[in-house]
C-alpha cells in the first residue's frame, strides 16, 4: 500500500536535531536551455531584445536589427581559425561556435540558442534558487555548447531523457550535500521533499525522475550487471611490426550501459532512491545507515505536454544516427522506436505524490510529438500547439514554409487544406498561399507545390499555463516562489489575454467546459438559437426607480444612482478566433526533419 501524504498550509519546522530539505528539480524541454537563451539575448539581441510590451512595429524593427547582427556573427565565425570548441575559448568565441548552424542543421529546427525561455525556465527564474531550485538543461543541449543530435532526435545518450534524469539525481545530491554542510551541530538528515517540473521530453524526464527516486521499481531498472571495457593497450611485436592489443577490465553497468562503482551497489542493485541514493553514497554525503533512515516525499509534479519520443541508443555519432538507425526510423515510422516509451520510462509509475498537474496542447499533431497522458494528475487541455503551452516562442513573424506539399498530397487537396486553415481561423487568406499553382497544373502535377503561411504572432498566451501551475501549487511549493509569475510574466497590458485567462481559469479551477473550436456554421446556428430563445423569453423592461423609497418601518430613504460600470466581454468563439490569428502557432512543417504532421493531422496519444 502506498504512503499517504498530507500537507497543511503552514511550513512546519523540523525537530531541532533533524534536517528537513525541500528541493525543486526543473527539467527543461528538447532544445531548450536557459543559459543558451541568455547568451543569445546578451550577444545577438543586445539592445534589440524583444520585450512583451513592444508593439508590432517595434518588434519588426528589432527583428531586422537582430538578423543583421546574426549575419555579422556568421562572418565572425567564418574568420575563426579553429571552429572546434576548446577550453581556451572566450565565452563569446564559444558562443559563436556553439550557436552556428551548418547546412544540415538548417534542414531541421533552429537550435537552443534561438529559443525563448520555457515555462520550466521561467518558473525556475522566479523561485528561490540557492536552496530550492535545481535546473537541468533541456534534452539535446549543453550549456554554451553545440546541441547534440542523439539527444534531440531520439532522447538518447548523455543529453537524452535518462541522461538528464541521472544528471538531475547528481545535481540534487550535490544540493543536499551543500545544504547539509550549512547545518551546525550534530543534526541528522531525516526528510527530503521533492517537487519536479518539466516540459516536452523534460516532462517525460520529470516523471521518470519521480519513478527513479520514488517509484516501485522493476528489477531491470535497478539491477547492475557485469561487463567489460577497454582499459588500455599493450604493444606486441609481430613479423609485420608492432601491434597494439587492447586490454579489458571488468566494469559494472546499469540497463542504460552507464558505468557505476560497485562499492555503492547493494545485492547487485542500485541503492534506495535509485541514482539519487547512489550519488548520495558515492559523494560521501550520507552513510548507508543514514540513507536507509531518510524519508523522501514527492510533493508536486508539474508538467507541460509530455512528449517522450525516446529510444536509448547511447551516444551514437552521426554515422549510425543517419545510417541504419535513421533509415529504420524513417521507414518504420516513429511508433517503431517511440511506441513503447510509457513502459520503458515507467511514465505511469511515479510512486506516491501529493499533487500532479499536466497541461496539454489541443492542436499539436506532429508525428514525433505524440502525447503521453498522466493518469491521476489534474490534466487540462488548452488550445494551441506544443510550445504555446510550454513556452519557447519569441514574438515576431512566423513563416511555415511547407505546411503541406505536392510531394505528399495532390493539388486539389492542397487547395482544400489551405481553405480549411482559413475556415478554421488559423490564417487570413492573404497570409497563406500555394506556390507554383499554374506551372503545377500545366505540367500535370510534375512541378513541386507547397502551402506557405506567414503571419505575425505573440508569445504571451503561454504565460497563462505558467500562472495556473503556480496557482495549483498554493500551500504546497508557492512559498518557494520569490517573484510571482503573474507579475514577472504579466499579461495585464494585453487587450485579449486577461479575458482568455478568465475563461480558461473557469475550466481549470471551477469545472467549466473545455474550450473547443466551433466552425462558423456551428457558431451561426448557435447564435440564431440564442436569438430565438431571447425572442420567446424577453427580458423584463427596466424601470428607473423613484428618487426615494420607504423601508419596512415607514422611514423614507433617498435612493442614489451609482456610476455605470461597463464590462467588456468576448464571446468564447470570437476570442478563440483572435487567439488563433494572433497568438497560437503552427508547428507542423514538412520543410524541417522531424516536424512532419501526422497524415490525418491528428495527434497520437499514449498512456490512456
Can you annotate each of these PLM segments?
Residues 1-608:
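Active-site- or binding-pocket-proximal scaffold segments within functional domains
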Amino acid at each position: 500500500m502506498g504512503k499517504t501524504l498530507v500537507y497543511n498550509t503552514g511550513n512546519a519546522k523540523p525537530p531541532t536535531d533533524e534536517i528537513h530539505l525541500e528541493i525543486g528539480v526543473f527539467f527543461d524541454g528538447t532544445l531548450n536551455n536557459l543559459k543558451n537563451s541568455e547568451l543569445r539575448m546578451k550577444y545577438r539581441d543586445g539592445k534589440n531584445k524583444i520585450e512583451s510590451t513592444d508593439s508590432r512595429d517595434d518588434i519588426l524593427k528589432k527583428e531586422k536589427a537582430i538578423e543583421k547582427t546574426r549575419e555579422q556573427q556568421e562572418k565572425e565565425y567564418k574568420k575563426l581559425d579553429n571552429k572546434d570548441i576548446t577550453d581556451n575559448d572566450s565565452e563569446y568565441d564559444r558562443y559563436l561556435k556553439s550557436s552556428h548552424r551548418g547546412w544540415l542543421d538548417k534542414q531541421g529546427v533552429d537550435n537552443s540558442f534561438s529559443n525563448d525561455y520555457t515555462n520550466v525556465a521561467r518558473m525556475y527564474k522566479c523561485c528561490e534558487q540557492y536552496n530550492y531550485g535545481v535546473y537541468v538543461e533541456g534534452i539535446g543541449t549543453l550549456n554554451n555548447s553545440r546541441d547534440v543530435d542523439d539527444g534531440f532526435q531520439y532522447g538518447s545518450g548523455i543529453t537524452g531523457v535518462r541522461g538528464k534524469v541521472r544528471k538531475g539525481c547528481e545535481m540534487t545530491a550535490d544540493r543536499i550535500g551543500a545544504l547539509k554542510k550549512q547545518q551546525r551541530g550534530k543534526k541528522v538528515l531525516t526528510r527530503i521533499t521533492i517537487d519536479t517540473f518539466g516540459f516536452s521530453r523534460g516532462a517525460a524526464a520529470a516523471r521518470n525522475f519521480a519513478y527513479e527516486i520514488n517509484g516501485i521499481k522493476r528489477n531491470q531498472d535497478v539491477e547492475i550487471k557485469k561487463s567489460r571495457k577497454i582499459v588500455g593497450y599493450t604493444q606486441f611485436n609481430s613479423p609485420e611490426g608492432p601491434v597494439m592489443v587492447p586490454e579489458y577490465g571488468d566494469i559494472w553497468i546499469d540497463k542504460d550501459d552507464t558505468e557505476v562503482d560497485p562499492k555503492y551497489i547493494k545485492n547487485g542493485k542500485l541503492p534506495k532512491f535509485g541514482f539519487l541514493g547512489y550519488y548520495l553514497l558515492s559523494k560521501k554525503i550520507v552513510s548507508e545507515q543514514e540513507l536507509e533512515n531518510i524519508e523522501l516525499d514527492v510533493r508536486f509534479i508539474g508538467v507541460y505536454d509530455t512528449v517522450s519520443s525516446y529510444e536509448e541508443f547511447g551516444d551514437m555519432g552521426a554515422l549510425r544516427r543517419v545510417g541504419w538507425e535513421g533509415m529504420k526510423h524513417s521507414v518504420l515510422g516513429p511508433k517503431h522506436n517511440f511506441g513503447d516509451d510509457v513502459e520503458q520510462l515507467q511514465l505511469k509509475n511515479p510512486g506516491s505524490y501529493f499533487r500532479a498537474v499536466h497541461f496539454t496542447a489541443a492542436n499539436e499533431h506532429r508525428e514525433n510529438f505524440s502525447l503521453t497522458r498522466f493518469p491521476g494528475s489534474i490534466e487540462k487541455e488548452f488550445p494551441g500547439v506544443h510550445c504555446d503551452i510550454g513556452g519557447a516562442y519569441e514574438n515576431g513573424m512566423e513563416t511555415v514554409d511547407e505546411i503541406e506539399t505536392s510531394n505528399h498530397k495532390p493539388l486539389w487537396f492542397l487547395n482544400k487544406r489551405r481553405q480549411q486553415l482559413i475556415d478554421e481561423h488559423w490564417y487570413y487568406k492573404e497570409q497563406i498561399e500555394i506556390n507554383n499553382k499554374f506551372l503545377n497544373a500545366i505540367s500535370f502535377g510534375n512541378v513541386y507545390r507547397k502551402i506557405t503561411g506567414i503571419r505575425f504572432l505573440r508569445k504571451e498566451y503561454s504565460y497563462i499555463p505558467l500562472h495556473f501551475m503556480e496557482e495549483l501549487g498554493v500551500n504546497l511549493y508557492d512559498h518557494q516562489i520569490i517573484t510571482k509569475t503573474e507579475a514577472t510574466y504579466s499579461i495585464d497590458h494585453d487587450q485579449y489575454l486577461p479575458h482568455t485567462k478568465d475563461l480558461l481559469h473557469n475550466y481549470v479551477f471551477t469545472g467549466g467546459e473545455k474550450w473547443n473550436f466551433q466552425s462558423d456554421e456551428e457558431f451561426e446556428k448557435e447564435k440564431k438559437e440564442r436569438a430565438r430563445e431571447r425572442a420567446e423569453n424577453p427580458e423584463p423592461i427596466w424601470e428607473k426607480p423613484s428618487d426615494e423609497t420607504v423601508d419596512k418601518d415607514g422611514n423614507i430613504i433617498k435612493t442614489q444612482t451609482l456610476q455605470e460600470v461597463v464590462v467588456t466581454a468576448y464571446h468564447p468563439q470570437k476570442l478563440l478566433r483572435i487567439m488563433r490569428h494572433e497568438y497560437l502557432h503552427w508547428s507542423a512543417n514538412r520543410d524541417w526533419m522531424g516536424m512532419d504532421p501526422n497524415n490525418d493531422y491528428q495527434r497520437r496519444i499514449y498512456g490512456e
